[in-house]
Amino acid sequence: MILVVDNYDSFTWNLVHYLMELGAEVEVVRNDAISAGQALSSGADAFLISPGPCTPNEAGVSLDLVAACVDAGKPLLGVCLGHQAIGQHFGGRVERGGLMHGKTSPVLHDDTGLYAGLPSPFLATRYHSLIVNAVPDSLVVNATAEDDTVMGFRHATLPIHGVQFHPESIATEHGHAMLANFLAIAGVELPSRLREGLGEGLSANAGAAMGTRPPLPPPAGGRGM
């Protein structure tokens, strides 16, 4: 099961639907409705911290969950605000960048982590005004925009990954494949029909398939910082 922390953002539900389309079981909880300890006790195989319209310091359990996943060695994906929370936890600076709401950018990457098997560059949709700078050595930058803005990183030794852009946006290329690679990192195997459909943009070591749920209606929400 993937536990998704919803930072009160409508994009959360796009992520949920993508994960379910890939065969994952998903539980969603608001950022002020659970503690990090409760999250770890939920039985989740992996965690996802969603986008949101605030800073990491205002994002409820998000920073505490990053710390808990680090201590427990649990797989974690942070998207936009979640990416910033991971960066801040490890000592990166979260600061103002250019306003990138609804803009697409080419993303260049090193073919590791979430980007295994994907072409470089690919187009990604960005909804943010904050970025992570001064990324510490514990985080390996593995994706950048053409102006060298950090678009993604992975922890050097832990299964922790962050993306500044939105893989769940319809205008982002290979979004399902990136999330499939995260599920593979978390040990969740895709059904063979999905693995074949994703083709080259899928990591080779996907783990065991999980059941799907009917789509969930999105709550009112904002856009990522």
Annotate each PLM feature.
Residues M1, P75-L77, R93, V140, ...:
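Proline-centered loop/turn at the N-terminus of a beta-strand
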Residues M1-S10, E168-R195, L202-M210, M225:
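RNA-binding accessory domains that recognize and position tRNA/RNA substrates
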Residues L3, L22, V28-R30, S35, ...:
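A generic "structured core" feature
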Residues L19-M20, C69:
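Hydrophobic alpha-helical packing residues
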Residues S41-A116, L123, L179:
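Cysteine-nucleophile active-site neighborhood
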Residues D111-L158:
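Catalytic beta-strand/loop cores that center a nucleophilic Ser/Cys/Thr
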Residues P121, T157, G162-E173:
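Phosphate-binding/catalytic loops
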Residues R195-G197, P218-R223:
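Glycine-biased, low-complexity coil/linker segments
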